């Protein structure tokens, strides 16, 4: 990897505990290869509320609400090496965590 690159990792999950464990694992892996790590930075939580009517016909005043929260974290790896990229490709993450990796020229 070139020294003028930065790796930006975005993590998303419905469970914040899984998200924090995954972020910790990624940071430890990157630091063990000698890369500089910035983060994890907590990003704003997305909250989606869904309202449905409880009864199938009338009684519109009787409603139920469900919500789902999406927690997000951001990790920047400054000056990643090829060893860092290889180590991050081998990291095992839980099934409930979505990861997005972008390489960015600085």
From Swiss-Prot:
GO terms for cellular component: ribonucleoprotein complex; ribosome. GO terms for biological process: translation. Keywords: Ribonucleoprotein, Ribosomal protein. Involved in the binding of tRNA to the ribosomes. Belongs to the universal ribosomal protein uS10 family. Gene3D superfamilies: Ribosomal protein S10 domain. NCBIfam families: PRK00596.1 (NF001861), rpsJ_bact (TIGR01049). Part of the 30S ribosomal subunit. This is Small ribosomal subunit protein uS10. One of its GO terms (molecular function) is tRNA binding. Pfam families: Ribosomal_S10. InterPro entries: Ribosomal_uS10, Ribosomal_uS10_CS, Ribosomal_uS10_dom, Ribosomal_uS10_dom_sf. Transmembrane segments: none annotated. The gene is rpsJ. The keyword Ribosomal protein applies.
